[in-house]
């Protein structure tokens, strides 16, 4: 059998074969590759070879199974383009367990009633092509920086549990309007729902909301009452850093939800960036330290 690869996104050969023959085990696929029962472009191929559009897979009668016909799904051009960027322009790190990307601001992590394009919708396209990507945490649409994506179910469980047990160390850079009273400190509060998609600070002993904890450190004084602050959230509540910055009296520049528009200078962007993530060896079997480059508008404000 001759199969012309039709995926524009490069994928591992074993994953591509698994999509064509769902009933086959990984062991059977690898044995077929070792015995040259499956070749790519007339060459012996390893399981981790990435096949792409234009490649040709030759399969002997070894499998003796019909190729599975998948339901045809239609994806928007924007989703396909974003999928390619996730694996190229945005990609910071990749191993067998996960990929890490530098998400730009204005791009949603997940879709919604008014959101047609998101990281999640692009992952659905990649998964349709044979991948098994899964989101394990999220960033606000307006927040840029590091976003981890699991490459399979088992890794997604490990990473999700690590976030839940507060084993993932995250650091954010923010430019704020105003400064906190203390240069270094910790913020503790409850965060509960408010009107619409807004959240609010509630009393620490209140039944409304969940406990939120953030460490912070003032890093640099900038011009026009602007300051660079490092935030390290212990918990991961919705809009936590934005609300805690507001509570400290120094809202994040460009935050149109929790900033004071009448006082704070106008900004097209919100200056909150997920800069660092640290995973200990106990999470995925090795220590991982990641850093995401600041966007151009952020570095421009720092000079």
From Swiss-Prot:
Residue intervals of the S4 RNA-binding domain: 11-70
The keyword Isomerase is assigned to this record: yes
Gene3D superfamilies in alphabetical order: Pseudouridine synthase, RNA-binding S4 domain
GO MF annotation, one: 23S rRNA pseudouridine(955/2504/2580) synthase activity
CDD domains in the cross-refs: PseudoU_synth_RluA_like, S4
Catalytic reaction(s) noted: uridine(955/2504/2580) in 23S rRNA = pseudouridine(955/2504/2580) in 23S rRNA
InterPro entries found in the cross-reference section: PsdUridine_synth_cat_dom_sf, PsdUridine_synth_RluA-like_CS, PsdUridine_synth_RsuA/RluA, RluA_PseudoU_synthase, S4_RNA-bd, S4_RNA-bd_sf
Role of this protein: Responsible for synthesis of pseudouridine from uracil at positions 955, 2504 and 2580 in 23S ribosomal RNA.
Protein name: Ribosomal large subunit pseudouridine synthase C
